[in-house]
């Protein structure tokens, strides 16, 4: 019998995601032997399953989704499941850093992803607790009010349903908020289990407990797994971290962040909406209807993975805070999630490398994967169909230029690798004379270094 961890004796609540605890677990077979398909998708979360669903809806009839463990047991099953184009305070930063065109692409794509989910729920009549609600980013201190006002103005100028609100119906003091109307929340596992049922029939397959080990070649691409080999015309990597990392060096261009969730019953009435503050530490709130009444999901306390020795304190901080602002009846659930974040905080979606139409990538969703994972599915589906997508530029995995990115990349590499480099960094040029203007390169000296 497995012994309990130290914090099981200290922290209240069931150590399991509410989403996974409240839905029967489906079962799909493992791969047996070698197969050939048109499209192979690695990863059984929202990005992988939505991509498979959209491709099948577009007429592709030979698709395989492979998952190393069980579908939806990773990040997707441990989300807070806000379906919104409001990703904290992002639009003012996007406008200043990337310009209006790319900020517009990000805004339009995530708003479209929200509506795509709503459309699928309606057309397939999926019972997944989908409900429209306003979403708020609030200022927890006066120092953040100007940022909130600027964000509201920028988001509104980009065509988003944004407004500035001076007062919120919360039990604690706030200093203004940016409100997005007509956003949504849902039960992600109910939603994606329904999509999985649509996928796994008529020549399309989901294979669980099938780990991808290696990806090689181009059309056909060969995926070596621990259960057999898959050959496919196109491959989509919708994993938390790319299996096929080189070229691209994504181990240097992504870092991991862990955050924590409590499922809380309170005696106070909870207002209509989803809420998150603009400061650190993050405090995020949303409600979920259950058979036992309303459950409030309280989340935050994010930190870089590996930098916290005592994770128990993160749960305790959330518990202390929620008890300070609400009358708590019970804490029924607790869980944590680990997210991948890119160095510029925009996901990598599209062709893994420019010019390669065989291998596609979706990663770095920065804790907003319900919409960005759906954006990934929409963009990659269009690319595989040979159809232009108006949002692909802002998410392009090859968007970094050496001179502009070198300082950030080097700094990120130190944090991400922690001494782990191995053979991933290979020489790119033989001689220094081969390096062009505004380029950087990796050289091998005569001593082999």
Predicted segments with their positions:
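Glycine-rich active-site loop/strand segments that organize a redox cofactor
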Residues: 74, 78-109
């Amino acid at each position: 019998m497995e012994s309990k961890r130290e914090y099981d004796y200290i922290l209240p609540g069931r150590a399991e995601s509410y989403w996974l605890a409240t839905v029967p677990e489906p079962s799909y077979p493992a791969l047996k032997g070698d197969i050939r398909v048109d499209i192979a998708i690695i990863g059984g979360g929202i990005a992988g399953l939505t991509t498979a669903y959209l491709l099948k809806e577009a007429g592709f009839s030979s698709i395989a989704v492979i998952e190393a463990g069980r579908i939806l047991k990773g990040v997707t099953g441990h989300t807070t499941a806000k379906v919104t184009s409001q990703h904290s305070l992002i639009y003012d930063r996007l406008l200043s850093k990337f310009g209006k065109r790319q900020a517009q692409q990000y805004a339009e794509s995530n708003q479209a992803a929200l509506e795509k989910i709503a459309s699928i729920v309606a057309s397939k009549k999926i019972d997944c607790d989908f409900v429209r609600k306003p979403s708020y980013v609030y200022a927890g201190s006066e120092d953040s009010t100007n940022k909130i006002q600027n964000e509201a103005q920028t988001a509104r100028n980009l065509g988003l349903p944004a407004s500035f609100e001076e007062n919120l119906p919360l039990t604690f003091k706030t200093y203004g908020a940016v409100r997005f109307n007509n956003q949504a929340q849902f039960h992600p596992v109910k939603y994606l289990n329904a999509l999985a049922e649509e996928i796994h029939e008529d020549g399309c397959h989901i294979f669980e407990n099938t780990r991808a080990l290696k990806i090689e070649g181009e059309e056909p691409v060969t995926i070596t797994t621990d259960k057999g080999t898959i050959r496919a015309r196109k491959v989509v990597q919708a994993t938390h971290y790319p299996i096929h990392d080189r070229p691209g060096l994504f181990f240097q261009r992504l870092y991991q962040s862990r955050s924590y969730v409590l499922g809380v019953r309170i005696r106070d009435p909870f207002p209509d909406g989803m809420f998150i503050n603009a400061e650190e530490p993050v405090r995020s709130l949303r409600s979920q209807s259950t058979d036992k009444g309303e459950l409030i999901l309280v989340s935050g306390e994010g930190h870089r993975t590996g930098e916290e020795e005592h994770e128990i304190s993160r749960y305790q901080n959330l518990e202390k805070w929620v008890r300070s602002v609400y009358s708590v009846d019970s804490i029924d659930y607790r869980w944590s999630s680990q997210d991948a974040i890119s160095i510029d905080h925009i996901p990598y979606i599209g062709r893994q490398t420019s010019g390669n139409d065989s291998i596609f990538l979706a990663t770095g969703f920065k804790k907003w994967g319900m919409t960005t994972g759906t954006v990934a599915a929409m963009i990659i589906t269009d690319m595989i169909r040979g159809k232009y997508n108006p949002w692909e530029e802002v998410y392009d995995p090859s968007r970094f230029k050496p001179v502009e990115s070198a300082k950030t990349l080097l700094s990120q590499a130190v944090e991400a690798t922690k001494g782990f480099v191995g053979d991933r960094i290979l020489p790119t040029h033989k001689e220094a004379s081969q390096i062009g203007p505004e380029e950087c390169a990796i050289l091998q000296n005569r001593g082999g270094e």
